[in-house]
Amino acid sequence: MALKKPKKSRLTTEEIKQQLEGSTIKEQSITKEVETSFLDYSMSVIVARALPDVRDGFKPVHRRALFAAFENGMTHDKPYKKSARWVGDVIGKYHPHGDQAVYQTIVRMAQDFSMRYLLVDGHGNFGSIDGDSAAAMRYTEARLSKISYELLKYIDKETVDFVPNYDASEQEPSVLPSGFPNLLTNGTTGIAVGMATNIPPHNLTEVCQAIKAYAKNHNVTISEIMEYLKGPDFPTGAEIYGDSGIIKYFNTGRGSVTIRSKYEIEDIGQGRVAIVVTEIPYMVNKANLIEKIVELVTNKQIEGISDLRDESSRDGIRIVIEVKRDVIPEVLLNKLFKTTPLQTNFSVNNLALVNGVPMVLNIKEMIKYYFEHQIEILVRRTNFDLKKAKERIHIVEGLVIAVNNIDEVIKIIKASGDDDIASKSLIQRFDLTELQTKAILEMRLRALTGLNIDKLKKEYEDLILVIKDLEDVLNNYNRQVNIICENLDYLIEKFGDERRTEIMYGVSSHIDDEDLIPVEDIVVTMSKRGYFKRLPIDTYKNQRRGGVGVQGLKTYEDDDVEKILVANTHTDLLFFSDLGRVYRLRGHEVPLGSRQSKGIPAINFLPIEKSESILTILPIDNYDQGSLFFTTSKGIIKRANLSDFESIRANGKIAITLKDGDKLFSVMQTLGNDEVFIGASNGNVIRFNENDAREMGRIATGVKGINLENDEYVVGTGLSSHGEYVLAVGSKGLGKLTDINDYRLTKRGAKGVNTLKVNDKTGNLVSIKVVNREEEALIITTSGKVIRLSIKDISVIGRNTSGVKLISLENKEEVKSIAIFKKEEINDEQLLQENDYNLK
């Protein structure tokens, strides 16, 4: 049996402390250490990595990359150099981090879809808006762009402070002179610890004009600045919807801007159109955008797209979305805007370092700090030039003395054993300074003897003027402002361009589909089996009385037309079912069809039960006007307040409680003192005041309206407010107009009086309508044929007559229903444009 090793006892805290005495290890609270270390790390990320300086708009990695290129002569007028060479210089001298981090920084500054104004001129594959990566740095070449020179110009004139690099072997600028307002024009984005920045790009011309406005009046308001600086201007163009977000971030430094793709609707022939997207929102990956649309179509979350393809090229973006025939392109676009990156929100957070401290800045503060930086650069540059001018004039003064005494100067130099003796001798003889004697001694004798006294005097006089001018600049603030403004004008002239992003003022990014649908008159038809469709009113010809008609509704062999009405695309349509329930749709929500199409069954677009069918439809424009007047096939009537039907749930609600064997025939909107007309299949019509039926609750059954016998049933209803005549139409195509005053006013519940002499020639009374002479009628037959005619062309005849022929019928064809509407007459010669919609 093996012996177990004795367990080592754990050291106590005191024993550990004793062992640590005299060592370099210090005892520290873990809580305090974590707090201190994390704070140090956070500040390092904020100040030295993630946030831009408000003066030049750069993070350290961008600043170091640009300075390294400038230092190595990689300017726009020099040949391209390998990107790997550039990256190596940055890493080796200034930025000891990963090569890919530095390379991606350079790549982004060369991408025209990322930068509003390119700072790097790239040669080779620098990535694409589809998210393609740039080629490896060993393959690509780059150099600074023309505008980058403005950022670094005068850096050699002590305009900015230099600091040691990471190992104190080199000096790097703490900030760039930035003669070009980079932060405002190119923007930036970055995530620090506990904070993030997201500054949008703006148009250079507008930014320069805004800075000039501030330079000339430091009390300029943000509203006045907005007269020059309109808002963001993104490299990818697109449109900004509304200016409320712009106003907010201009004033507070924070806000949200809605960016929407720019598009055109093109006709692609055969009655079809395509949505062509030409500009997309900033920072949107085009490939991912297309993939998202495909995903939504595949999952049937978006319907109405027949084809999608990317035809983008070097000339620009072109995403083609082919639209199905039965889809309104603006409505489809609105859905795409809501569900895809075709519309995005840019959340602005103007966070930048001000004297090393992170601050959220409004637009005026950003302009202010940039302007103050330019004043400082100008002053430091002027001081540098002044110092150099004074040094030069001092040298020129010495050279003038030397030329005036050239023989003696040469004699002293030749007689001296070395430069030190010569310098002392010249100083002693001519009262020169060491700088002057040094300049004299550094010249060859030939050059010294060749100096022209007149040229020296001219240079001296010029230097006097230069010094005077430079001193005036330093002492005159107005001159400093003017110089800054002149530089801004130079930037506008050389680099200014037109705005790419259009701002849509006074609009909302939240647009309902209906806002995009034009208000148009429509015809809604319903078949006996419950098939519905919507057609433009102009689908039908206006024909004279007795015309043959056009095919208006294609139905199944055992189906025929039941109802037809006229409304518009924005009208509320209340669908009343045989079970006494009501459902609501807008006119444009009814499936669109053509003259020959079958239509769509109600169960496909209404939440009805399988045993339920729609019997009538009522268009409503205003729920505050009047009542609803219900009539059933058995002559039961009910009056209800229209406002009770304004709020209808998605699954509908009860409209009337029906007795066994009865069904709803019609629902009319009354105005409070209307006279009601009800026609029966026996040819009788009753006329009574609507107030004979008191208003009842929504689920009430109602009272008797007309006295019917045996198998008689209601065939038509109307109101006195509808017109001056009763239009009566028989099943055989005969009809007539009769003055409403020919019908005596009775109480509800009576049998009524005869309106159509029913016989084999007329057939049963099919429908009655109350009309006026300015209206028009659509008459629809059991075969689906439709004729449109003017009421004024129908004869006015007495009550107890058969009428005249309104429509020519074939074989066993009969009149099924009629609809009345107001419409400008269309001449017989006018051709109709066939709307060949393909319903799926």
From Swiss-Prot:
Motif mapping: GyrA-box: 543-549
* Localization per Swiss-Prot or TrEMBL: Cytoplasm
Q: What positions constitute the catalytic site?
A: Y139
Reaction(s) catalysed (UniProt annotation): ATP-dependent breakage, passage and rejoining of double-stranded DNA
Keywords noted in UniProt = ATP-binding, Cytoplasm, DNA-binding, Isomerase, Nucleotide-binding, Topoisomerase
Sequence ranges assigned to domain Topo IIA-type catalytic in this UniProt record? 51-516
Known InterPro entries for this protein? GyrA (IPR005743), GyrA/parC_rep (IPR006691), Gyrase/topoIV_suA_C (IPR035516), Topo_IIA-like_dom_sf (IPR013760), Topo_IIA_A/C_ab (IPR013758), Topo_IIA_A_a_sf (IPR013757), Topo_IIA_dom_A (IPR002205), Type_II_DNA_Topoisomerases (IPR050220)
Q: What is its EC number?
A: 5.6.2.2
Q: Which Pfam families match?
A: DNA_gyraseA_C, DNA_topoisoIV
Q: Which GO terms describe its biological process?
A: DNA topological change; DNA-templated DNA replication
Q: Which PROSITE patterns has this protein been placed in?
A: TOPO_IIA (PS52040)
Q: Which GO terms describe its cellular component?
A: chromosome; cytoplasm; DNA topoisomerase type II (double strand cut, ATP-hydrolyzing) complex
Highest taxon of source: Bacteria
In the record, what terms sit under GO molecular function?
ATP binding; DNA binding; DNA negative supercoiling activity
Question: What assembly does the database describe for this protein?
Answer: Heterotetramer, composed of two GyrA and two GyrB chains. In the heterotetramer, GyrA contains the active site tyrosine that forms a transient covalent intermediate with DNA, while GyrB binds cofactors and catalyzes ATP hydrolysis.
Q: Which family does it belong to?
A: Belongs to the type II topoisomerase GyrA/ParC subunit family.
Q: What does this protein do?
A: A type II topoisomerase that negatively supercoils closed circular double-stranded (ds) DNA in an ATP-dependent manner to modulate DNA topology and maintain chromosomes in an underwound state. Negative supercoiling favors strand separation, and DNA replication, transcription, recombination and repair, all of which involve strand separation. Also able to catalyze the interconversion of other topological isomers of dsDNA rings, including catenanes and knotted rings. Type II topoisomerases break and join 2 DNA strands simultaneously in an ATP-dependent manner.
Q: Which NCBIfam families match?
A: gyrA, PRK05560.1, PRK05561.1
What remark does the entry add? Answer: Few gyrases are as efficient as E.coli at forming negative supercoils. Not all organisms have 2 type II topoisomerases; in organisms with a single type II topoisomerase this enzyme also has to decatenate newly replicated chromosomes.
Question: Which protein is depicted?
Answer: DNA gyrase subunit A
Q: Which organism is it from?
A: Ureaplasma parvum serovar 3 (strain ATCC 700970)
- The gene name reads gyrA
